[in-house]
């Protein structure tokens, strides 16, 4: 599909990701976190919102093992999952 | 011997010719300046309207921190994986689809295996369908546009961390878009070959 020819006026310009490429997890260091995340997706009918804790844990595993540049979790979109921030406060 | 009326008429003609020449020269200079200004003006126009799939200004970590998910606008994202004919990897998505909302970061996984007995370096590009939705599809981190070396018989997970811009929910052209397909294609990286960033036109 990505190799389909695009006739006419449509154009698509791929953009590099904001923070570059993930290093490869050659030794499967975060594989167990990925499996937990995938199991959650299957159990929750692939709704991303219900598995954000597992994706946060996977990214934290990568940061801890130098497989991702360290970044505050708020800047990765997990502000509402941070402890000490009740939901009502975020909605103010 | 010319009479005064004729001389005045010639002076009037000479003055009008100068005026016309001045206007023509000004128009030429103006058109030259407008052609130089067209590139930044067009880029500015595309950034504000998002036409042509150009990058929209204002995407950064600070924006991610302050995003508010639009929870009533669910979008199904499906995943596709391809390899070029000369690349002997097994490459596939690890989930068929996920349901996301604009303004919420999401994680998805691909898996790649090198079943050969020598190391292979692959490099991938991606495509988003429909194209108009591509301007709202923002990848924070993935595996594209960089060489990825797989050793013999090695298999790795390849995550994609992305979000759909909250402005997606405000765009009237996106009202009927509730399915976005993300396609990745891996190519083999040849030694010494400079791969340009591809564009489809």
Swiss-Prot record, chain A:
InterPro entries linked to this entry: CHCH, COX19, Cys_alpha_HP_mot_SF
Subcellular location: Cytoplasm, Cytosol; Mitochondrion intermembrane space; Mitochondrion
One of the protein's GO biological processes: intracellular copper ion homeostasis
Disulfide feature: 30-61, 40-51
Motif Cx9C motif 2 mapped to chain: 51-61
UniProt keyword terms in alphabetical order: Acetylation, Cytoplasm, Disulfide bond, Mitochondrion
Pfam family, one: CHCH
Sites of N-acetylserine modification: 2
Main location: cytoplasm
Motif stretch (Cx9C motif 1): 30-40
Cellular component aspect of the GO annotation: cytosol; mitochondrial intermembrane space; mitochondrion
Acetylation is among the record's keywords: yes
Superkingdom of the source species: Eukaryota
Record's compositionally biased regions (Polar residues): 1-12
Keyword Mitochondrion in record: yes
CHCH domain sequence ranges: 27-69
Region Disordered: start-end pairs: 1-20
Family: Belongs to the COX19 family.
Assembly and interaction partners: Interacts with CHCHD4/MIA40 forming transient intermolecular disulfide bridges.
Role this protein plays: Required for the transduction of an SCO1-dependent redox signal from the mitochondrion to ATP7A to regulate cellular copper homeostasis. May be required for the assembly of mitochondrial cytochrome c oxidase.
Classification via PANTHER family: CYTOCHROME C OXIDASE ASSEMBLY PROTEIN COX19 (PTHR21107:SF2)
Protein name: Cytochrome c oxidase assembly protein COX19
Source organism (scientific name): Mus musculus (Mouse)
